[in-house]
Amino acid sequence: MEKILIFGHQNPDTDTICSAIAYADLKNKLGFNAEPVRLGQVNGETQYALDYFKQESPRLVETAANEVNGVILVDHNERQQSIKDIEDVQVLEVIDHHRIANFETAEPLYYRAEPVGCTATILNKMYKENNVKIEKEIAGLMLSAIISDSLLFKSPTCTEQDIAAAKELAEIAGVDAEEYGLNMLKAGADLSKKTVEELISLDAKEFTLGSKKVEIAQVNTVDIEDVKKRQPELEAALSKVIAEKNLDLFLLVITDILENDSLALAIGDQASKVEKAFNVTLENNTALLKGVVSRKKQVVPVLTDAIAE
């Protein structure tokens, strides 16, 4: 049987890695030949989950067409967030929980997008729908994905479905979701050894908002000041990326996972749109965003509206 590659977005987060592994597991149990792969380096939070549940990180790839004809996308659909040669392969399926944008195919496909907080929540349903048992280790990874995307159930993206799925998966994995989750998030929030280049690319996504090219990166921390004191270096790194990619705006969202607030650092010609979107005033290119923790639900929609006006 012809092999299929399953992967999430560039600059992978925990949901992207763990959902690729989980969906490949499900597809293989259903008789397919699927391999999970990744499009970037594994972050500290994800590595904690992989180590805890004794799972290998997926293989790193830059292109797919040299290996396979068909691919499955998880946790994304926008082409600029996907593999470099996405135009040269057939997208067979998409399992996602984000907006649909900049996406079209020449052939029909299976597309499943649900307004939940995490791709793994959808996959939990799909295991049940196919009467396939979720193994302990896979359940642990799926739980990790939900905890990550929902910031331990505190994010406004988190739904009752996510909470219910996490409860089921924690039971299968044999862990206390709150205790394990806090340890995992803290592992991801240790930024002390990261270079500024790593910080701004750990969880960065490029968007086309109206006619503007915007990159939004998010980092989690337990102390915003630890990141803010590196602001001169960060601004230089952001400006470099803006020049290289011809961006109109680079927005770095520094999220305090304990206080559930974020600091915005905005660089670029469209930085004033951040002020408009959040009704704040940028001082030295930064502004506190009270209660903002979700890029998907609290940043992208309002920034899209501000840029469109």
From Swiss-Prot:
Keywords from the UniProt entry: Cytoplasm, Hydrolase, Manganese, Metal-binding
For this protein, the record's SUPFAM superfamilies field holds: DHH phosphoesterases
Q: Does the keyword Hydrolase apply?
A: yes
One GO CC term of this entry?
A: cytoplasm
List the catalysed reactions.
Answer: diphosphate + H2O = 2 phosphate + H(+)
For the ligand (Mn(2+) 2), the binding residues are D15, D75, H97, D149
Describe the family membership recorded for this protein in Swiss-Prot or TrEMBL. Answer: Belongs to the PPase class C family.
Designated name of the protein: Probable manganese-dependent inorganic pyrophosphatase
Q: Report which gene this protein is encoded by.
A: ppaC
